[in-house]
Amino acid sequence: MESRPPAVATSQLAVLAPHGLIVFQLLLIFTVFREFQLEQSSGLLSLAFLIVGGFAVHAALPVAYRMPFFLALSLGAFVIALGTAAIAVAAAGILLVAICHLPVDFRIRVGLIASTAVLAAIAVLEGIPGVTAGTSRRAVAVFASMFMFRIIIYMYDLRHERVRVPIATRLSYFFLLPNAVFPFFPVVDWGAFKRTYYDRPPVEIYQRGVRLMFRGAIHLLLYRYVYYHLTKSPDAVYGIRTVAVYLASSWLVYLHVSGIFHLVVGILCLFGFNLPETNRLYFLASSPNDLWRRVNVYWKDFMLKIFYMPSYKALQNRKISMRSSMILATIVVFVATWLLHSYQWFWLVGRFPLTWVDAVFWGVFGALVVVNTAMQLGPRSRVVSPRNAGWSPGGAVTHVLKVMGMFTLMSAMFSWWSTRDPATWIYLLGSVRESAPRALLLFALGVIAVFVAGVAAHYAAHRGWTLGIGKSVLPFSRSVFLTLAGSILLLASSRPEVQQSLGTKGLMLLSLERERLNARDAAIEDRAYYEALITTDQPANPVFEVRDEAEADLVPIRNSAAVRYTGDALIYELLPSRTTRNRGSDLTTNALGIRDREYPAVKRPGTYRIALIGASVIMASGADQNRSFEALTEDRLNAERPDERFSNYEILNFAVAGYGFHQFVLTTERKVLRYDPDVLLIGALAGDHAVTRTGIAELAAKDVPLDPELTAILRQAGIGESAGIVEIKRKLGSGNTMGKIRAWAYQRIAERCRERGVIPVFMYIPRLESDEYSPGFDEMAGDARAAGMAVLDLRGVYDGRPRAELMFHRRDVHPNEIGHRLIADRLYSEILRQAPAFGLQTRGQTPRATDNQ
């Protein structure tokens, strides 16, 4: 066998070695994503082997075959991500591209595309058969994200295109591989897409892609830290420290967008598309115009091409001055930005919100850019490139103050956007006045420390001591070292033995390892039943998340057709004999107005009747009614008949999603006791506190009459008749006010039960997510025992099972049918174990009224 010349072998090794290092880095990066569950909900990891293997094959192919291979690989990614819906997406996409190239007048093609968009919009709103039927909501969002902006750019450039472009390139522009899992996608420019394809040496582009992906992972981890540990609910904001954290974290959550966009561009670089960065050191912007140039650069370029330049040229043609033309064109850009964000929201979620809060946000930002532009065009303006200017203390101080001011401004604006309520926002800022002198001093020292660090960093940057931060090009060996070292450190930090050795810092690292709701949003999941605006308005920040079919059905029950409003402290109740769709399952009520089977109002002889009260988990939100823990427990009681004195067992489920302690009391007094139960079982979760706090705050702010004893508790907490809802929430959350309300509710329920000869029993069910943010078992069970109730402790019911396997939906902490089966098994065991507390006689036991041990 003829051996290859040494020179050839060496040349091949020189090519293969960098490719091998790149593959190794990719495997490490995707391992980091797996260990920390980064972008788990997007499905990125399902494409990991396709991306890594596809890169290896793509890089080895002759250049002429790479683009067709990338297109085929992208279509494969769409199939993996969307299943059979990918066929419809591909067919519709090819049809749209074909319309762009019809041999008819350009205006006719634009009209056809616009007509297609209108039909698609109607399909989204009305559900036209054949368009949305059988096609997932996510597939619709992905398809829309492929074309809603890119086809505008494509048609704009197509009109001036003179060079023949292969069909594989044209289709690849729309069917970009990462778009299969990221519907919220950067607006890639058609010209840049073509121009940057292998515009640098391949290995340099590939390694840049790896570095961008790693940087994206870092951004996502930083976002997760901000989201889990810094973001706060408005009612938890009080004083200078929490106000500062609330403002800053509102702007810092943009790291999520930045991380995703870095990932997208990094993946595309692996296949030769050397696209520019989408976001660049945006937290260091020194002016509104500087921020506009740094943040979401693709959007800025899109607006310049489609709106700014045409508007500017049209104004110039009308003999309007250059200064006025630039200012007016900038105004056009920001009006268009406001409208197009709603347009984007429509395609991704299905609603077209035009709120004045958004108008103010974009209006203020646009006005700042206009003023900044006017100042730069003024006769005294002087632009000095920081790179060419020498360093001076005065220049450094000015620049750092501008950066700090811009960060503060954007933090304030994003907090305005996330709060959604001007009165609440102003109240939060006003709470700074109540700060202690020591807190103000510490805050001032912190600001000074940041300022000094900024001046030092400014000096270091001018001396070239950047450690590669912000550089778009690094030597291959240095880039590989940084990526490998960073990935290995992250993987090491995920090891349990390392985390244990780090103490509290290790616990913080552990908290970053999974995708979950933070304290604020976990509370919102409960509070949403009361605060319709939280769930029906658009998101609290511009980080769009596409909802699939199950998630889109997460409508608070108080906003559904299943309830009627009572006009008093109960707020709402279920309508009798009604079937509606809610949280992925049919919600059917019986003639008694409860979500349960039909039962006679009068208890029949030989029947043992349990009444059940609680909130959404107890009502079995998201689960099939006949497979809820209540129904399963009832079936087993009737099958096994633990007490031979009873021939029939009934569990009447009076629970209603969104109810709090005060509504448990009203439900007991108005409904439960009317049906002569033997036992009242109170289903309790730690989340009951957040629901109760928001519900009572809503009622108190509207001066709805409350129980005199409850009103007295509110007055003791300093809650007057004229207090606003945010102030009421804050005062309810301070001290032991919620504990007093809970104790009052349990005591009142127990008293009413004893008056009617009913046994009150307390049942604690742990949250699927976590109890770490709310009072838990000890406090709640202590109050229940003090009220004379027996206590069923169901903690540990989910042990041994992955929590994600038991959740109704990744964004919904309600248990699914598997979770309900676990609860039913445990509840039945507890009923047998504490049979005397239930007034049951099983195998020689004698009944007793309560079990407070």
Regions found by a protein language model. Name each.
Residues R609-A611, R636, R641, S647-Y675, ...:
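Internal alpha/beta domain cores that form substrate/cofactor-binding pockets in large enzymes
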Residues R516-E644, G800-P802:
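Membrane/wall-proximal cationic-aromatic binding patches
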Residues R150, P183, H341, A615, ...:
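Generic structural signal for small/hydrophobic residues in well-ordered secondary structure
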Residues E2-R495:
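Membrane-embedded transmembrane alpha-helical bundles that form the catalytic cores
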Residues L517-E531, L685-M789, L794-H809, Q841-G844, ...:
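Serine-dependent acyl-ester chemistry module
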Residues F346-R351, S621-Q625, Q663-V665, V691-A697:
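Short, solvent-exposed loop/turn and secondary-structure capping segments
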